[in-house]
Protein backbone atom coordinates (compact mmCIF):
# COMPACT_ATOMS: atom_id res chain seq x y z
CA UNK A 1 0.00 0.00 0.00
CA UNK A 2 1.37 3.41 -0.96
CA UNK A 3 1.96 6.38 1.30
CA UNK A 4 -0.97 8.54 2.36
CA UNK A 5 -1.00 12.03 0.90
CA UNK A 6 -3.36 14.77 -0.26
CA UNK A 7 -3.72 15.49 -3.97
CA UNK A 8 -5.73 18.66 -3.72
CA UNK A 9 -7.59 20.94 -1.29
CA UNK A 10 -10.46 23.11 -2.53
CA UNK A 11 -12.37 25.70 -0.52
CA UNK A 12 -16.12 25.29 -1.05
CA UNK A 13 -17.30 28.19 1.10
CA UNK A 14 -18.11 28.80 4.74
CA UNK A 15 -20.87 27.94 7.18
CA UNK A 16 -22.23 30.33 9.76
CA UNK A 17 -23.45 28.54 12.88
CA UNK A 18 -25.40 30.06 15.74
CA UNK A 19 -24.31 27.53 18.36
CA UNK A 20 -22.49 28.23 20.65
CA UNK A 21 -22.21 31.89 19.51
CA UNK A 22 -23.35 34.11 16.68
CA UNK A 23 -19.82 34.47 15.34
CA UNK A 24 -19.15 30.74 14.90
CA UNK A 25 -17.91 30.44 11.30
CA UNK A 26 -16.46 27.26 9.78
CA UNK A 27 -14.83 27.00 6.38
CA UNK A 28 -15.72 24.02 4.18
CA UNK A 29 -12.87 22.26 2.39
CA UNK A 30 -13.08 19.42 -0.12
CA UNK A 31 -9.98 17.25 0.35
CA UNK A 32 -8.98 14.78 -2.35
CA UNK A 33 -6.69 12.00 -1.07
CA UNK A 34 -4.22 9.73 -2.88
CA UNK A 35 -6.88 7.03 -3.42
CA UNK A 36 -9.10 9.63 -5.18
CA UNK A 37 -11.55 9.68 -2.27
CA UNK A 38 -13.02 13.12 -1.54
CA UNK A 39 -13.97 14.23 1.97
CA UNK A 40 -15.59 17.43 3.23
CA UNK A 41 -14.02 18.88 6.38
CA UNK A 42 -14.86 22.01 8.38
CA UNK A 43 -12.25 24.22 10.04
CA UNK A 44 -12.45 27.55 11.87
CA UNK A 45 -10.04 30.29 10.84
CA UNK A 46 -8.46 30.27 14.30
CA UNK A 47 -7.74 26.54 13.89
CA UNK A 48 -6.18 27.13 10.48
CA UNK A 49 -3.98 29.89 11.89
CA UNK A 50 -2.77 27.68 14.78
CA UNK A 51 -1.97 24.97 12.23
CA UNK A 52 -0.06 27.57 10.20
CA UNK A 53 2.01 28.71 13.21
CA UNK A 54 2.98 25.12 14.09
CA UNK A 55 3.95 24.46 10.47
CA UNK A 56 6.31 27.45 10.52
CA UNK A 57 7.91 26.20 13.75
CA UNK A 58 8.47 22.77 12.20
CA UNK A 59 10.14 24.23 9.10
CA UNK A 60 11.91 27.46 10.19
CA UNK A 61 14.12 27.67 7.09
CA UNK A 62 11.20 27.33 4.69
CA UNK A 63 9.23 29.81 6.86
CA UNK A 64 11.95 32.44 6.43
CA UNK A 65 12.80 32.59 10.13
CA UNK A 66 16.54 32.40 9.38
CA UNK A 67 16.65 34.15 6.02
CA UNK A 68 13.46 35.84 4.73
CA UNK A 69 14.61 35.25 1.15
CA UNK A 70 14.31 31.47 1.66
CA UNK A 71 10.64 31.61 2.66
CA UNK A 72 8.35 29.33 0.63
CA UNK A 73 5.60 28.73 3.21
CA UNK A 74 2.78 31.15 2.34
CA UNK A 75 1.70 34.00 4.60
CA UNK A 76 -1.58 33.89 6.52
CA UNK A 77 -3.00 36.91 8.37
CA UNK A 78 -3.79 36.56 12.05
CA UNK A 79 -7.50 36.30 12.95
CA UNK A 80 -9.28 39.21 14.58
CA UNK A 81 -11.63 38.90 17.50
CA UNK A 82 -14.70 40.31 15.78
CA UNK A 83 -14.37 38.86 12.29
CA UNK A 84 -17.87 38.88 10.85
CA UNK A 85 -19.41 37.71 7.60
CA UNK A 86 -17.55 40.30 5.51
CA UNK A 87 -14.23 39.11 6.95
CA UNK A 88 -15.22 35.49 6.32
CA UNK A 89 -15.91 36.32 2.68
CA UNK A 90 -12.57 38.11 2.38
CA UNK A 91 -10.74 35.16 3.96
CA UNK A 92 -12.02 32.84 1.22
CA UNK A 93 -9.65 34.18 -1.43
CA UNK A 94 -6.76 34.10 1.03
CA UNK A 95 -7.46 30.51 2.07
CA UNK A 96 -7.90 29.36 -1.54
CA UNK A 97 -4.47 30.71 -2.45
CA UNK A 98 -2.97 29.44 0.82
CA UNK A 99 -4.15 25.84 0.26
CA UNK A 100 -3.01 25.88 -3.36
CA UNK A 101 0.47 27.01 -2.32
CA UNK A 102 0.64 24.37 0.43
CA UNK A 103 0.04 21.61 -2.12
CA UNK A 104 2.86 22.94 -4.33
CA UNK A 105 5.47 22.85 -1.53
CA UNK A 106 8.13 20.09 -1.32
CA UNK A 107 6.74 16.75 -0.18
CA UNK A 108 8.48 16.95 3.19
CA UNK A 109 6.04 19.80 3.95
CA UNK A 110 2.99 19.00 1.80
CA UNK A 111 2.97 15.39 3.01
CA UNK A 112 4.11 15.87 6.60
CA UNK A 113 2.00 14.20 9.34
CA UNK A 114 1.02 17.59 10.79
CA UNK A 115 -0.66 18.65 7.55
CA UNK A 116 -2.27 15.26 6.89
CA UNK A 117 -3.70 15.01 10.41
CA UNK A 118 -5.14 18.53 10.24
CA UNK A 119 -7.19 17.77 7.11
CA UNK A 120 -8.37 14.30 8.15
CA UNK A 121 -12.09 13.85 8.82
CA UNK A 122 -13.01 14.47 12.46
CA UNK A 123 -16.16 13.33 14.27
CA UNK A 124 -17.47 16.92 14.20
CA UNK A 125 -17.21 16.93 10.40
CA UNK A 126 -19.75 14.11 10.25
CA UNK A 127 -22.28 15.66 12.60
CA UNK A 128 -25.37 16.98 10.87
CA UNK A 129 -27.52 19.78 12.32
CA UNK A 130 -30.40 18.41 14.35
CA UNK A 131 -33.99 19.20 13.46
CA UNK A 132 -34.71 20.66 16.90
CA UNK A 133 -32.25 23.53 16.51
CA UNK A 134 -34.06 26.86 16.68
CA UNK A 135 -31.89 28.41 13.97
CA UNK A 136 -30.24 26.38 11.22
CA UNK A 137 -26.69 27.04 10.00
CA UNK A 138 -26.34 29.37 7.04
CA UNK A 139 -24.14 28.19 4.17
CA UNK A 140 -22.31 30.55 1.79
CA UNK A 141 -20.76 28.98 -1.30
CA UNK A 142 -17.73 30.16 -3.21
CA UNK A 143 -18.63 31.49 -6.67
CA UNK A 144 -17.36 29.17 -9.39
CA UNK A 145 -15.37 31.97 -11.00
CA UNK A 146 -13.83 32.95 -7.67
CA UNK A 147 -11.29 30.12 -7.53
CA UNK A 148 -7.68 31.14 -7.55
CA UNK A 149 -5.44 29.95 -10.35
CA UNK A 150 -3.03 28.73 -7.70
CA UNK A 151 -5.25 25.68 -7.22
CA UNK A 152 -4.50 24.58 -10.78
CA UNK A 153 -1.03 23.47 -9.72
CA UNK A 154 -2.27 20.01 -8.75
CA UNK A 155 -5.38 20.02 -10.91
CA UNK A 156 -8.80 21.30 -9.83
CA UNK A 157 -11.45 19.01 -8.39
CA UNK A 158 -14.32 18.53 -10.83
CA UNK A 159 -17.55 17.60 -9.07
CA UNK A 160 -19.54 14.79 -10.64
CA UNK A 161 -22.95 15.62 -12.07
CA UNK A 162 -26.00 13.41 -11.48
CA UNK A 163 -29.69 13.57 -12.41
CA UNK A 164 -32.72 12.93 -10.21
CA UNK A 165 -34.81 9.97 -11.44
CA UNK A 166 -37.81 10.77 -9.23
CA UNK A 167 -39.22 13.37 -6.86
CA UNK A 168 -37.73 13.34 -3.36
CA UNK A 169 -39.29 15.11 -0.39
CA UNK A 170 -36.79 15.92 2.32
CA UNK A 171 -37.52 14.65 5.81
CA UNK A 172 -35.15 16.93 7.75
CA UNK A 173 -33.56 20.35 7.45
CA UNK A 174 -30.18 18.88 6.52
CA UNK A 175 -31.58 17.18 3.40
CA UNK A 176 -32.42 18.65 -0.01
CA UNK A 177 -35.66 18.15 -1.94
CA UNK A 178 -35.51 17.07 -5.59
CA UNK A 179 -37.80 17.04 -8.59
CA UNK A 180 -37.50 14.55 -11.43
CA UNK A 181 -34.87 15.77 -13.87
CA UNK A 182 -33.01 18.04 -11.44
CA UNK A 183 -29.26 18.04 -12.07
CA UNK A 184 -27.01 18.19 -9.01
CA UNK A 185 -23.28 18.18 -8.28
CA UNK A 186 -22.11 15.56 -5.80
CA UNK A 187 -19.75 16.97 -3.18
CA UNK A 188 -19.34 13.83 -1.06
CA UNK A 189 -20.36 10.20 -1.50
CA UNK A 190 -20.88 8.72 1.95
CA UNK A 191 -20.73 4.95 2.42
CA UNK A 192 -24.12 5.22 4.14
CA UNK A 193 -25.76 5.87 0.77
CA UNK A 194 -26.55 9.50 1.65
CA UNK A 195 -24.71 11.87 -0.71
CA UNK A 196 -24.02 15.53 -0.01
CA UNK A 197 -25.02 17.50 -3.11
CA UNK A 198 -25.38 21.04 -4.30
CA UNK A 199 -27.76 22.58 -6.84
CA UNK A 200 -27.26 26.29 -7.51
CA UNK A 201 -27.29 27.84 -4.03
CA UNK A 202 -28.86 24.83 -2.28
CA UNK A 203 -26.93 22.10 -0.50
CA UNK A 204 -28.03 19.02 1.40
CA UNK A 205 -28.07 15.24 1.75
CA UNK A 206 -29.85 13.10 -0.87
CA UNK A 207 -30.30 9.30 -1.07
CA UNK A 208 -27.97 7.99 -3.77
CA UNK A 209 -30.73 5.71 -5.02
CA UNK A 210 -32.59 8.78 -6.39
CA UNK A 211 -29.65 9.78 -8.59
CA UNK A 212 -28.19 8.44 -11.84
CA UNK A 213 -25.06 9.39 -13.81
CA UNK A 214 -25.66 11.42 -16.95
CA UNK A 215 -23.55 9.30 -19.31
CA UNK A 216 -24.53 5.79 -18.21
CA UNK A 217 -27.06 4.03 -15.96
CA UNK A 218 -24.21 2.15 -14.26
CA UNK A 219 -22.20 3.49 -11.33
CA UNK A 220 -18.61 3.13 -12.53
CA UNK A 221 -17.18 3.64 -9.04
CA UNK A 222 -18.90 0.58 -7.58
CA UNK A 223 -16.10 -1.83 -6.56
CA UNK A 224 -15.94 -5.48 -7.55
CA UNK A 225 -17.29 -8.11 -5.11
CA UNK A 226 -14.81 -9.49 -2.59
CA UNK A 227 -15.97 -13.00 -1.75
CA UNK A 228 -13.22 -13.39 0.86
CA UNK A 229 -15.34 -10.96 2.88
CA UNK A 230 -14.51 -8.27 5.44
CA UNK A 231 -15.58 -8.84 9.07
CA UNK A 232 -18.26 -6.40 10.28
CA UNK A 233 -20.65 -6.18 13.23
CA UNK A 234 -24.26 -4.99 13.18
CA UNK A 235 -24.55 -1.89 15.39
CA UNK A 236 -28.32 -1.66 14.94
CA UNK A 237 -30.94 -4.35 14.38
CA UNK A 238 -32.71 -4.47 11.04
CA UNK A 239 -35.62 -6.59 9.83
CA UNK A 240 -35.63 -7.48 6.15
CA UNK A 241 -38.34 -5.84 4.05
CA UNK A 242 -37.49 -7.28 0.64
CA UNK A 243 -36.89 -10.96 -0.09
CA UNK A 244 -33.24 -10.34 -1.03
CA UNK A 245 -32.39 -8.63 2.27
CA UNK A 246 -30.96 -10.11 5.49
CA UNK A 247 -32.31 -9.56 9.01
CA UNK A 248 -29.75 -9.04 11.78
CA UNK A 249 -29.80 -8.39 15.50
CA UNK A 250 -27.49 -5.87 17.10
CA UNK A 251 -24.07 -7.41 17.73
CA UNK A 252 -24.28 -10.16 15.10
CA UNK A 253 -21.08 -10.70 13.09
CA UNK A 254 -21.16 -10.89 9.29
CA UNK A 255 -18.85 -10.68 6.29
CA UNK A 256 -19.28 -7.90 3.73
CA UNK A 257 -18.69 -9.20 0.20
CA UNK A 258 -19.82 -6.23 -1.93
CA UNK A 259 -19.79 -2.55 -0.94
CA UNK A 260 -22.24 -0.70 -3.18
CA UNK A 261 -22.38 3.09 -3.27
CA UNK A 262 -26.14 3.26 -2.75
CA UNK A 263 -25.60 2.26 0.89
CA UNK A 264 -26.98 -1.28 0.58
CA UNK A 265 -24.12 -3.75 0.92
CA UNK A 266 -24.20 -7.46 0.16
CA UNK A 267 -23.30 -9.41 3.29
CA UNK A 268 -22.80 -13.08 4.16
CA UNK A 269 -24.12 -14.64 7.35
CA UNK A 270 -22.98 -18.27 7.46
CA UNK A 271 -24.02 -19.45 3.97
CA UNK A 272 -26.77 -16.84 3.49
CA UNK A 273 -26.19 -13.72 1.36
CA UNK A 274 -28.34 -10.62 0.96
CA UNK A 275 -28.57 -6.83 1.17
CA UNK A 276 -28.14 -4.91 4.43
CA UNK A 277 -27.92 -1.14 5.21
CA UNK A 278 -24.25 -0.18 5.41
CA UNK A 279 -24.93 2.56 7.97
CA UNK A 280 -25.93 -0.15 10.49
CA UNK A 281 -22.56 -1.92 10.14
CA UNK A 282 -19.21 -1.25 11.79
CA UNK A 283 -15.84 -2.89 11.14
CA UNK A 284 -14.99 -5.55 13.69
CA UNK A 285 -12.66 -4.34 16.41
CA UNK A 286 -13.68 -0.67 16.20
CA UNK A 287 -15.62 1.46 18.67
CA UNK A 288 -19.27 0.47 18.30
CA UNK A 289 -20.72 3.06 20.70
CA UNK A 290 -19.25 5.98 18.76
CA UNK A 291 -20.62 4.62 15.48
CA UNK A 292 -24.05 4.17 17.06
CA UNK A 293 -24.11 7.81 18.19
CA UNK A 294 -23.42 8.95 14.63
CA UNK A 295 -26.58 7.33 13.25
CA UNK A 296 -28.75 10.40 12.66
CA UNK A 297 -31.33 9.02 10.26
CA UNK A 298 -32.69 5.80 8.81
CA UNK A 299 -31.29 3.79 5.96
CA UNK A 300 -31.75 5.33 2.50
CA UNK A 301 -34.51 3.86 0.32
CA UNK A 302 -33.54 1.22 -2.22
CA UNK A 303 -33.94 1.91 -5.93
CA UNK A 304 -36.46 -0.94 -6.19
CA UNK A 305 -38.79 0.84 -3.72
CA UNK A 306 -38.93 4.17 -5.61
CA UNK A 307 -42.12 4.83 -7.55
CA UNK A 308 -42.48 6.72 -10.84
CA UNK A 309 -38.84 6.37 -11.85
CA UNK A 310 -37.92 8.28 -15.02
CA UNK A 311 -34.45 7.49 -16.36
CA UNK A 312 -32.84 9.08 -19.42
CA UNK A 313 -31.10 5.80 -20.28
CA UNK A 314 -32.59 3.09 -22.49
CA UNK A 315 -31.28 0.17 -20.46
CA UNK A 316 -31.37 -0.50 -16.74
CA UNK A 317 -28.42 -0.76 -14.40
CA UNK A 318 -26.27 -3.88 -14.45
CA UNK A 319 -26.54 -5.63 -11.12
CA UNK A 320 -25.60 -9.11 -9.96
CA UNK A 321 -28.57 -11.19 -8.88
CA UNK A 322 -28.72 -12.75 -5.44
CA UNK A 323 -28.40 -16.16 -7.10
CA UNK A 324 -25.08 -15.06 -8.61
CA UNK A 325 -23.86 -13.75 -5.25
CA UNK A 326 -24.93 -17.00 -3.58
CA UNK A 327 -23.29 -19.28 -6.17
CA UNK A 328 -20.01 -17.37 -6.15
CA UNK A 329 -20.00 -17.19 -2.36
CA UNK A 330 -20.65 -20.95 -1.96
CA UNK A 331 -17.94 -21.73 -4.50
CA UNK A 332 -15.45 -19.54 -2.61
CA UNK A 333 -16.35 -21.04 0.79
CA UNK A 334 -15.97 -24.59 -0.53
CA UNK A 335 -12.55 -23.78 -1.92
CA UNK A 336 -11.49 -22.15 1.36
CA UNK A 337 -12.64 -25.19 3.36
CA UNK A 338 -10.71 -27.57 1.10
CA UNK A 339 -7.56 -25.54 1.57
CA UNK A 340 -8.04 -25.52 5.34
CA UNK A 341 -8.25 -29.35 5.61
CA UNK A 342 -5.00 -31.04 6.79
CA UNK A 343 -3.67 -33.54 4.24
CA UNK A 344 -0.61 -34.71 2.34
CA UNK A 345 1.62 -32.06 1.00
CA UNK A 346 1.03 -31.16 -2.60
CA UNK A 347 3.79 -32.16 -5.05
CA UNK A 348 4.81 -28.57 -5.54
CA UNK A 349 5.04 -27.57 -1.87
CA UNK A 350 8.43 -26.46 -0.46
CA UNK A 351 8.41 -29.20 2.21
CA UNK A 352 7.86 -31.97 -0.36
CA UNK A 353 10.58 -30.56 -2.64
CA UNK A 354 13.03 -30.64 0.27
CA UNK A 355 12.18 -34.28 1.00
CA UNK A 356 12.67 -35.26 -2.65
CA UNK A 357 16.03 -33.52 -2.69
CA UNK A 358 17.18 -35.39 0.40
CA UNK A 359 16.12 -38.74 -1.13
CA UNK A 360 17.98 -38.08 -4.38
CA UNK A 361 21.31 -37.32 -2.68
CA UNK A 362 23.73 -40.36 -2.99
CA UNK A 363 24.80 -41.96 0.29
CA UNK A 364 28.59 -41.95 0.96
CA UNK A 365 30.33 -45.31 0.23
CA UNK A 366 31.61 -47.41 3.19
CA UNK A 367 35.42 -47.82 2.89
CA UNK A 368 36.74 -51.47 2.81
CA UNK A 369 38.39 -52.98 5.91
CA UNK A 370 42.21 -52.81 5.62
CA UNK A 371 44.13 -56.07 5.27
CA UNK A 372 46.28 -57.56 8.08
CA UNK A 373 49.54 -56.83 6.21
CA UNK A 374 48.55 -53.16 5.76
CA UNK A 375 47.70 -52.85 9.44
CA UNK A 376 51.06 -54.42 10.49
CA UNK A 377 52.98 -52.05 8.24
CA UNK A 378 51.24 -48.84 9.43
CA UNK A 379 50.07 -49.46 13.00
CA UNK A 380 51.86 -48.83 16.29
CA UNK A 381 53.90 -51.43 18.21
CA UNK A 382 51.14 -51.96 20.80
CA UNK A 383 48.63 -52.71 18.00
CA UNK A 384 51.08 -55.16 16.42
CA UNK A 385 51.42 -57.05 19.75
CA UNK A 386 47.61 -57.25 20.12
CA UNK A 387 47.26 -58.63 16.61
CA UNK A 388 50.01 -61.19 17.19
CA UNK A 389 48.43 -62.40 20.44
CA UNK A 390 45.03 -62.68 18.70
CA UNK A 391 46.51 -64.87 16.00
Swiss-Prot record:
Residue ranges of domain SH3 in the record: 157-216, 227-286
Keyword Cytoplasm in annotation: yes
Keyword field contains Phosphoprotein: yes
Ranges for region Disordered: 286-391
Organism of provenance: Homo sapiens
Summary of the function given for this chain in its UniProt record: May be required for activation of the latent NADPH oxidase (necessary for superoxide production).
Residue ranges, compositional bias (Basic residues): 310-319
Chain's gene name: NCF1B
InterPro entries: NADPH_Oxidase/PX-Domain (IPR051228), NCF1_C (IPR015039), NCF1_PBR/AIR (IPR032136), NCF1_SH3_1 (IPR035756), NCF1_SH3_2 (IPR035757), P47PHOX (IPR001655), PX_dom (IPR001683), PX_dom_sf (IPR036871)
Modified residues (Phosphoserine): 304-305, 321, 329, 346, 349
Short name of any one Pfam family annotated for the protein: NCF1_PBR_AIR
A GO molecular-function descriptor: phosphatidylinositol binding
Protein name: Putative neutrophil cytosol factor 1B
GO biological process: respiratory burst; superoxide anion generation
Cell compartments where the protein resides: Cytoplasm
Key words of the record: Cytoplasm, Phosphoprotein, Repeat, SH3 domain
Annotated GO CC locations: cytoplasm; NADPH oxidase complex
Domain PX: residue ranges: 1-126
